[in-house]
């Protein structure tokens, strides 16, 4: 199976202009506003973690409350309710201020479909349980970055270069607090892998000056 972070494509319902200002907590300082909303919505849909607050409250919604709201995951996925309707009906504010813009990867130009992907960090609300949706995610788990890399190296999981590189960067830190501190000291630089052909095979590589220590992935062995 493929190991991925929760996420997906921005939807019209994620547009800040479509959401009443009172529905969104103060936006994070980094990353496009619409994509911050997308990150929270997709994480809720795919793994039930909800970065939101009850209106007038400072803490995140409780694990019990998040579980009670779980049926909205499928309503949002199916287009049976909008994000604005969900938030207004349940008196919630998105906690965009908890997001930290971590990375920006752009699909190589030789690919038929290209994406401009932004990664965000956030500390999971206490006691909230990650639960797969059975559609976009079939299994969810908390794994330390170093352990995830071991599972990828062993062939237990497959992963794309952006996932591997981000895991490598995080594995250099002792804990979540250090990952966040480290990211706040960095500028987010758009990264586009390039294809390199060598005698040993084809490689995807990124520049060595964009903040990653792991910079390549073999995608095809040599036929020689």
Predicted regions located by residue number:
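Structured loops at beta-to-helix junctions and adjacent beta-edge loops in soluble globular domains
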Residues: 8, 102-105, 123-125, 170, ...
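Terminal peptide-recognition signature
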Residues: 43, 120, 167
């Amino acid at each position: 199976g493929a190991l991925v972070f929760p996420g997906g494509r921005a939807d019209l319902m994620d547009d800040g202009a479509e959401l009443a200002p009172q529905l969104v907590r103060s936006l994070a300082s980094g990353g496009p506003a619409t994509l911050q909303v997308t990150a929270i919505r997709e994480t809720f849909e795919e793994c039930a973690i909800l970065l939101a607050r009850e209106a007038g409250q400072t803490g995140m919604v409780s694990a019990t409350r998040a579980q009670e709201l779980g049926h909205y995951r499928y309503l949002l996925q199916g287009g049976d309710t909008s994000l604005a309707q969900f938030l207004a009906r349940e008196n919630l504010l998105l906690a965009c201020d908890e997001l930290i813009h971590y990375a920006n990867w752009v699909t190589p130009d030789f690919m038929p479909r290209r994406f401009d992907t932004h990664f965000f960090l956030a500390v999971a609300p206490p006691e909230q349980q990650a639960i797969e949706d059975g559609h976009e995610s079939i299994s969810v788990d908390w794994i330390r970055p170093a352990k995830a890399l071991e599972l990828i190296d062993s062939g237990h999981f497959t992963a794309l270069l952006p996932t591997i590189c981000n895991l490598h960067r995080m594995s250099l830190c002792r804990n979540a607090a250090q990952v966040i501190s480290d990211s706040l000291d960095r500028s987010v630089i758009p990264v586009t892998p390039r294809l390199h052909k060598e005698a040993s095979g084809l490689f995807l590589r990124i520049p060595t000056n964009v903040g990653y220590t792991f910079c390549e992935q073999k995608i095809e062995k040599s036929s020689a």
